[in-house]
């Protein structure tokens, strides 16, 4: 049985997010994407940083996460970017079936 997950990725540029979304969907690596504008605060080289960011959430099969990471790396401007894989442990069978039917992952 396939394992499913949501991946959270933070960006600082909306156009970068849009290019990434288009590529992920075109390659059939994700079934859906949501973008949320947020204010983030973090430590970077022992200094506190605060900035507007865009959080991208994608739904996919866990076995495609490496391909997704490699594709995001092509579009992402951050030296070190958030790529948090969150298992989907409880949802409807119909939702998982929808992800399964939409996500295929083209070969690179």
Feature annotation, model-predicted:
Residues 1-108:
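Positively charged, small/polar-rich N-terminal and surface patches that mediate targeting and assembly
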């Amino acid at each position: 049985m396939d394992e499913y997950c949501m991946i959270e990725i933070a960006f600082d540029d909306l156009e970068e997010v849009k290019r990434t979304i288009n590529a992920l969907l075109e390659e059939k690596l994700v079934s859906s994407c949501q973008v949320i504008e947020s204010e983030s605060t973090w430590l970077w080289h022992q200094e506190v940083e605060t900035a507007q960011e865009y959080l991208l959430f994608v739904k996919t099969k866990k076995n495609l996460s490496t391909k997704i990471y490699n594709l995001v790396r092509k579009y992402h401007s951050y030296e070190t970017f958030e790529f948090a894989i969150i298992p989907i442990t409880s949802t409807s069978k119909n939702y998982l079936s929808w992800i399964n039917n939409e996500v295929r992952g083209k070969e690179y």
